[in-house]
Amino acid sequence: MKIVVYHAEECDRKKCTSLKLGRKGKFKIVSSLNQLPRGALVLNPFSEKAVSPEDRDMVLRRGIAALDCSWKKVKKSSVIFQTARNHRSLPFLVAANPTNYGKPCILSTAEAVAATLYIVGLKDIASDIMSYFKWGPHFLDLNRELLEAYSRAENSLEVVEIQKKFIGG
């Protein structure tokens, strides 16, 4: 399974989770959008469709494409969000990384990819990715109840319903 990350060079390279996982051989880091795999699930915080277990086959066959950029600079108009299909957003989760600890929905690239893998039922791979960070296992523990609920949903609509119940929407 491919996990390909377009790196926008907007972060502190010493703290960058995707670069660390690239060095470990877990992520392929690319500098051109043309290098993203066709048909991959594209993590897009602006997508109206949430990641769900129904995306498992797509992830296994085509992989995951993510954008590593500053949350302060990410825009709906970003080229990556215009060039591909299969866009998915993540449902409500809380960050455990030191930069954004406790902030809802402001996940690192590693957290976002691990959450995607967990939700589609690839929990062992999600745990492996998080094991490269001291705080990584805590991300899974902190969000375990939600991740388990999302991973039992049938589809994106059910994931959104679970999220609404949790946050009171």
UniProtKB/Swiss-Prot annotation:
Domain of life: Archaea
Annotated binding of S-adenosyl-L-methionine, by residue: T17, L67, L90, T109
Reactions mediated catalytically: an N(1)-methylpseudouridine in rRNA + S-adenosyl-L-methionine = N(1)-methyl-N(3)-[(3S)-3-amino-3-carboxypropyl]pseudouridine in rRNA + S-methyl-5'-thioadenosine + H(+)
InterPro entries, per the entry: Tsr3-like, Tsr3_C
Molecular function per GO: 18S rRNA aminocarboxypropyltransferase activity; S-adenosyl-L-methionine binding
Keywords: Cytoplasm, Ribosome biogenesis, rRNA processing, S-adenosyl-L-methionine, Transferase
An annotated GO BP: enzyme-directed rRNA pseudouridine synthesis
Record Pfam families: Ribo_biogen_C (PF04034)
Subcellular localization: Cytoplasm
Documented EC number(s): 2.5.1.157
GO CC aspect terms: cytoplasm
Primary enzyme class: transferase
Role of this protein: Aminocarboxypropyltransferase that catalyzes the aminocarboxypropyl transfer on pseudouridine corresponding to position 914 in M.jannaschii 16S rRNA. It constitutes the last step in biosynthesis of the hypermodified N1-methyl-N3-(3-amino-3-carboxypropyl) pseudouridine (m1acp3-Psi).
Family: Belongs to the TDD superfamily. TSR3 family.
HAMAP family the record matches: TSR3
UniProt-recorded name of the protein: 16S rRNA aminocarboxypropyltransferase
